[in-house]
Amino acid sequence: MKPVRKFIGIFIASWFALLASSSTAFANSSIQKVIDQKYKQPDYVIGSSLNEFEVEQTLSLLMYNEEQEKEWKTMNPSAYTSFRIDENGDHSSSVKLQKQAKKAPVSVHIVTPQNITEVTADMHRNALTTLGLEHADITIASPTEASGLSAIAAVSYSLEQSGSKISDENKILAQEELSLLAAIYKENARKNNFHEDKLNVAVIDLKIAALKGSNQDKKLEKKDFQKLVTRILETYQLNGAITDKQTKQLVDFTSKLANSKLNSDKNLVKSFKALKQDIIEKAGDSFNTIDTKHDTESLLKESDNLPLYPMIGLGLLILLGIGLMSYHVHRHQTKRNKL
């Protein structure tokens, strides 16, 4: 029995390895499950830097009802570190998170746009979708001037306190994306050939292409991501605005995403597509001269390459079959020798 046990053991171990690699998908699906089950009433998370008076201001801005709603939370400073944010920094961004009445892309409303200086609502929507949210209503407020970059950590804190499991990889990629979007917007906002809606949709296309293109038996190289970013920027008429440095940053981010475990989350691409369509529909005539329905998913794919996981599974089945055949041949020969 030793040969067959050996091959069965290899097969089972490899199967569990594949399951482990898709743990991100299960973790992210639990995020939406928690939102649907536990956020019929909104949850409030207050920035860690606010004093008592500012807390009262913020709760009022977020329309908190003490008599009808559950107790609000203060952000734990140490929770910022998983997003690579300095826990000792000045964090005044606060959030309200609630289940949506209807299933639509993540909604973000900034009630103090004069104080949130670096991050727009759609930038937050983009990064929060990368974090793993599918459908939720989020309100952001700050009583003092703030970048807004720490709001995503407050959303994550609320979800984890309610039982969600969010991987560090999701957190880091979402925060890096938010910071990159904010930096590109800040440097290019006054250029005539720059448009924030186009930037957000371009980044969504980069994410879709990276996640779908990475799920194949082909090691993607830096030049593949460089070609992808160049093509997407040209498609959305941003190549004249985005600098070489920013292009390189987009290439690096896309490469990290493609090499992450996020490609095992089947709902993520679906969420990105829904968000893309929503932004385009609300952007007026900004996309009239752009082909927004191009085949984003295949930009990093090669048609003659089979997906990696099915190939691994097929290989394991072949090995198992060879093992069983070897065992039966060995057993038959042993019986003949005894005779």
Q: Residues of each region from the PLM?
A:
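Signal peptide-directed extracytoplasmic domains
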Residues: 79-133
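Bacterial N-terminal signal peptides that target proteins for export
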Residues: 1-11
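Juxtamembrane/start-of-transmembrane alpha-helix segments at the extracytoplasmic/lumenal side
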Residues: 300-317
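C-terminal membrane-anchoring or membrane-association module
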Residues: 316-339
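Membrane-proximal extracellular "stem/stalk" segments
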Residues: 218, 227-305
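C-terminal segment of classical bacterial N-terminal signal peptides
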Residues: 17-25
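Basic/polar, acidic-poor N-terminal "presequence/leader" segments
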Residues: 26-103
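Soluble oligomerization/assembly scaffold segments of membrane-associated complexes
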Residues: 123-252
